[in-house]
Amino acid sequence: MKKICYILLFIMFLVPISTNALENSNENNKDDTKDNSINLIENATSGLLMEQSTGKIIFEKNKDKQVAVASMTKMVAQTIILENIEKGKIKWTDIVEVSKNAADMGGSQIYLNTGEKMSVKDLFKGISMASANDAVVAMAEYISGSEKEFVKLMNNKVKELGLKNTKFKNSTGLDEDGHYSSAYDMGIIARNLLMHEEILKFSSVYEDYLREDTENKFWLVNTNKLVRFYKGADGLKTGHTDAAKYCLAATAKKDNMRLIAIVLGEENGKVRNSETMALLDYGFNTKKVTILKKKNQVIKKIK
């Protein structure tokens, strides 16, 4: 009889424990939905925060609004360059001769000269760190024969990714009518670029040099200051034009989680950086990624 009583008491204690477990599970599910109740990017036109491995949106503001995105455009160009390298169509060591058209590009640049020869690796470094317009046009011409043909590849990539609010007119992101994207589309583009792990070898570097063994040695400083001043940040792409204002696609990794933060239309670089860091802080402080063990993998033996 005593034994039966003990069993009944044990079952009674189990019931509230099970109920609490269900309540906790529901709370966890609520945490997985995007939270727009707080304004993390008050000054931005639009933006979002995404968990990279799942693509889950944690926070968003006007994510589908079509806006100018400046040099964040180059993330698609970078993707195409990396795809061509992975397919063996071009090599990092290939030497590209710079055309007058590429050398004459304005805006951010590494000051290429007409007829100058530079490796694909150094041109890609110039694109990734200095957001160089002359370098991206030189690579566009090397791959497709002309920037116009290369932009067709960029727009095809956009269609391949299923994006509805993006259209490109050039490879640089310089202001042009009909050239636009959205925070959501930029998030997907950034996520796709990060599938090519080679990108982080370039985007994570804060300073480097081009033409290092020549009298024209050129100091490169990453336009994305977060890679130096935010723990875990290792990319990805800045942007700034009159129409786009100040923009940033940032990525950072802490523990098992990588986040992608997009901010568009900020008034200045300082606010852009601070609001991007606020987005990342929010994600890392409130979200967790659980890594599931593989099927049949032994977690712990019970003795």
Give names to the regions the model predicted.
Residues 1-23:
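Sec-dependent N-terminal signal peptides of Gram-positive bacterial secreted proteins and lipoproteins
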Residues 2, 127, 302-303:
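Soluble, non-transmembrane domains of envelope/secretory-pathway proteins that act on or interact
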Residues 3-4, 25-31, 295-296:
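N-terminal cationic leader/targeting segments used for protein routing and processing
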Residues 14-15, 86, 287:
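Hydrophobic alpha-helical membrane context
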Residues 21-184, 188, 193-197:
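Active-site-adjacent loops and short helices of periplasmic peptidoglycan-processing enzymes
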Residues 163-167, 175-303:
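Domain-terminus/edge residues, biased toward the C-terminal soluble/receptor-binding domains
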